[in-house]
Amino acid sequence: MKLNISYPVNGTQKTIEVDDEHRVRVFYDKRIGQEVNGEAVGDEFKGYVFKIAGGNDKQGFPMKQGVLLPTRVKLLMAKGTSCYRPRRNGERKRKSVRGAIVGPDLAVLALIITKKGDQEIEGITNESVPKRLGPKRANNIRKFFGLTKDDDVRDFVIRREVVKGDKTYTKAPKIQRLVTPQRLQRKRHQRALKVRNAQAQREAAAEYAQLLAKRLTEKKAEKAEERKRRASSLKA
């Protein structure tokens, strides 16, 4: 069985192959989300605590949280369900998934280090992979640098260097949800347009109602005149 061990603190992960079944037997009958003492896996993991995050069986079917079985099942899945990505709107599909209980039929088991042990694990705890991209949303940049609302977020956005041929230039993401005077002005303009359009519609509706009432009055007067004319011709 392969153990895919990740360490979110450093942003690293590594796959370790374990040939001895006795070493991975400690994970059997455990569920996704449960924690396991690393000392049972090997002396190099002494003091470590692993959390089971998921895995795949030997045919490549993923483990699904909430399916309390050590076997494979077929479930009807819709949008928002893990292990399924709909291709069309409203599409549902019955798909095979592996239960959340660990067994010997697994090929890969994903583990997360929740507590670091005494020794360093080569390629996982002794290395650090910095995040390639910084925060993009204005509030997240403020939170990241501990800024107040008065500080200008644009000065703190994380830029990255891009080398293209002989030229080296920096690139920064477009800050999302950034409140600027231009944005406030645009909002005021849109609100004023909305009010102006509503007023114009009300005036047009009132004008139409007035015209309609005038036409109805004229029609009534014409009909009354016609009735009067007929009555006078009958008398004659």
UniProtKB/Swiss-Prot annotation:
Family named by the database record: Belongs to the eukaryotic ribosomal protein eS6 family.
Posttranslational mods: Phosphorylated.
InterPro entries: Ribosomal_eS6, Ribosomal_eS6-like, Ribosomal_eS6_CS
Protein name: Small ribosomal subunit protein eS6
GO biological process, one term: translation
GO MF term set: structural constituent of ribosome
Organism: Eremothecium gossypii (strain ATCC 10895 / CBS 109.51 / FGSC 9923 / NRRL Y-1056) (Yeast)
Residue numbers carrying Phosphoserine: S232, S233
A cellular-component GO term for this protein: ribonucleoprotein complex
